[in-house]
């Protein structure tokens, strides 16, 4: 084969092997592969590495993506159980983790995932010390905190997918109620990616028209149009419903992760609702990870948007922080 290659090509300089647009995805389950596929399909990376502990499935997923490369912009797809393959990654996306067993407490699930992360995070940092780490595994807020502690990286380079998808679901449901495009609805879900998330009704607007000014009790118990029940509750329940119907969620989170990756590679400075260390914001004084709107660039997070929340929204955010802090404090690192 080498002689044939020499007959085809005349080398004038050695090829560059290291990549400046490299993404690693850890975990090749439904979510991990949805992330990998979305990144590949949107031509965001020139090298995509997959890592998992199940060698056969890992190889199969790699081959399946490789066989589609003729239909995309060129991207090198690699896979291995050895983390050395991840060296030089600009972004590491962590989707691996244990699933909740029937009757298992949340803290028990978190602790099992902590043990898994102990084998993942130090390896990623070892081979890519300048990387940004995006945590997708659930419970995402607590595991992002765990990742920050295990990695030793500055807090701006460790963040979770958080309520970015929740915010997208929120806008979609608002768009259905208002009969306009989701991209024309502006609204945010902050706090925990989970049951204690907070819908920022005070900021929901269409073309600068704030719904809260038109209907001051929107989202509150006195709201006779039941916006909270019809919109926010559906946001919280939607993942449970999808899991009940098809067994897992994958495509929407994959698209969300691809959009975040695009923000890093293009240094677009878009605002996303990502899980970050919220100490010092909205009166929270502990190292707890929750989602707030943040500005994302090529080196990670640069700013937190200082939303003007109502007293009720701040209190709900504090309740969310308290619930997550209790879980964090129970973790054995």
From Swiss-Prot:
It catalyses: (S)-lactate + NAD(+) = pyruvate + NADH + H(+). It comes from the Eukaryota. It is an enzyme of class 1 (oxidoreductase). One of its GO terms (cellular component) is mitochondrion. Substrate binds at residues 106, 138, 169, 249. Keywords: Cytoplasm, NAD, Oxidoreductase. GO terms for biological process: lactate metabolic process; pyruvate metabolic process. The active site is at 193 (proton acceptor). One of its GO terms (molecular function) is L-lactate dehydrogenase activity. InterPro entries: L-lactate/malate_DH, L-lactate_DH, L-lactate_DH_AS, Lactate/malate_DH_C, Lactate/malate_DH_N, Lactate_DH/Glyco_Ohase_4_C, NAD(P)-bd_dom_sf. Homotetramer. Belongs to the LDH/MDH superfamily. LDH family. This is L-lactate dehydrogenase. It comes from Caenorhabditis elegans. The gene is ldh-1.
């Amino acid at each position: 084969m080498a002689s044939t290659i020499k007959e085809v090509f005349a080398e004038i300089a050695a090829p560059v092997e290291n990549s400046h647009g490299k993404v690693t995805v850890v975990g090749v389950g439904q979510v991990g592969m949805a992330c990998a596929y979305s990144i590949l399909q949107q031509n965001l990376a020139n090298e995509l590495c997959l890592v998992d502990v199940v060698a056969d499935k890992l190889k199969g997923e790699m081959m399946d993506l490789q066989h589609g490369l003729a239909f995309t912009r060129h991207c090198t797809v690699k896979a291995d159980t050895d983390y050395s393959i991840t060296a030089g990654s600009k972004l590491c996306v962590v989707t691996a983790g244990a699933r909740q067993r029937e009757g298992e407490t949340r803290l028990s699930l978190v602790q099992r995932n902590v043990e898994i992360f102990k084998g993942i995070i130090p390896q990623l940092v070892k081979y890519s010390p300048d990387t940004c780490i995006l945590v997708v595994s659930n419970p995402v807020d607590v595991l992002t905190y765990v990742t920050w502690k295990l990695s030793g990286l500055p807090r701006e380079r460790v963040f979770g997918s958080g309520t970015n998808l929740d915010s997208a679901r929120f806008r979609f449901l608002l768009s259905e109620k208002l009969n306009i495009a989701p991209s024309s609805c502006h609204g945010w879900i902050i706090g925990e990616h989970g049951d204690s998330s907070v819908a920022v009704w005070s900021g929901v607007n269409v073309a600068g028209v704030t719904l809260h000014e038109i209907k001051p009790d929107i989202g509150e118990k006195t709201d006779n149009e039941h916006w909270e029940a019809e919109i926010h509750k559906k946001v919280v329940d939607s993942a449970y419903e999808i899991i009940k119907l098809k067994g897992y969620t994958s495509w929407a989170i994959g698209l969300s992760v691809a959009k975040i990756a695009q923000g890093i590679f293009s240094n677009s400075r878009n605002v996303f609702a990502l899980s970050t260390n919220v100490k010092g914001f909205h009166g929270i004084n502990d190292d707890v990870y929750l989602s707030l709107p943040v500005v994302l660039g090529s080196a990670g997070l640069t700013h937190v948007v200082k939303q003007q929340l109502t007293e009720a929204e701040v209190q709900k955010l504090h309740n969310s922080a308290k619930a997550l802090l209790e879980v964090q404090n129970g973790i054995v690192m």
